[in-house]
């Protein structure tokens, strides 16, 4: 349920939206709360570093940053390898707690992917490391969701600690994948 390779995100001079990155506005609003929808993670599977994923294309994981923190079932997407996706139905909130400035801060982060591979447990060492692959730093208990399409357990794909991209935020966003069905699911944990 885990990948045997791991890469981290590091602070760079500026984010490069031509490859793998965290946070981009979609230009759409959440149908539940009205918050700006974001592509929280874009992975370029054509990048040799991510060949271990076995997906030769671009994977985009999108969510409402407001609703995903409250959605018990998380938010799932069906993706295509050309970087497009469809956000599947989810249970959202009525009230939006995100201000526009917070969305700007989130999408204007400077994270870039590490050039060198990290130890497979690198992401499990602390609560301030954003990773792709390897093992997660579970805030609560480990949690491998079932694919909403086929019902099999999904593989852990990535983690993003909210406070690394948004001041004073709490908790961690976990992203899991079913490569066969081309589904990603995002969910939140915090103490």
Predicted ranges, named:
Residues 1-191:
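Preference for intrinsically disordered or flexible, low-complexity segments
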